[in-house]
Amino acid sequence: MAKKSLIAKNKRPAKFSTQAYTRCERCGRPHSVYRKFKLCRVCFRELAHKGQIPGVTKASW
């Protein structure tokens, strides 16, 4: 889990657009965040396996 202070800091609007960065909406992780879902890869995988993200299926070929 991310520090509460960093999560609160991220919710404030950035002074400049280049300072803005993505964080996971669920756990606050700053790295490996999918913009479309606003989730990190770890949370995305957990929710996808549970079937809580509509339209997402595990690839098999």
Curated annotation (Swiss-Prot):
Binding site for Zn(2+): 24, 27, 40, 43
Keyword Ribonucleoprotein: yes
Gene Ontology molecular function: any one: rRNA binding
SUPFAM superfamilies attached to this UniProt entry: Glucocorticoid receptor-like (DNA-binding domain) (SSF57716)
Organism domain of life: Bacteria
GO biological process: translation
Cellular-component GO terms for this entry: small ribosomal subunit
InterPro entries: Ribosomal_uS14, Ribosomal_uS14_bact, Ribosomal_uS14_CS, Ribosomal_uS14_sf
Required co-factors: Zn(2+)
Entry keywords, A to Z: Metal-binding, Ribonucleoprotein, Ribosomal protein, RNA-binding, rRNA-binding, Zinc
Entry's cofactor comment: Binds 1 zinc ion per subunit.
UniProt subunit comment: Part of the 30S ribosomal subunit. Contacts proteins S3 and S10.
Family, per entry: Belongs to the universal ribosomal protein uS14 family. Zinc-binding uS14 subfamily.
Biological role stated in the UniProt entry: Binds 16S rRNA, required for the assembly of 30S particles and may also be responsible for determining the conformation of the 16S rRNA at the A site.
Protein name as it appears in the record: Small ribosomal subunit protein uS14
Species whose genome carries this gene: Streptococcus thermophilus (strain ATCC BAA-250 / LMG 18311)
Organism lineage: Bacteria, Bacillati, Bacillota, Bacilli, Lactobacillales
Gene transcribed to yield this protein: rpsZ
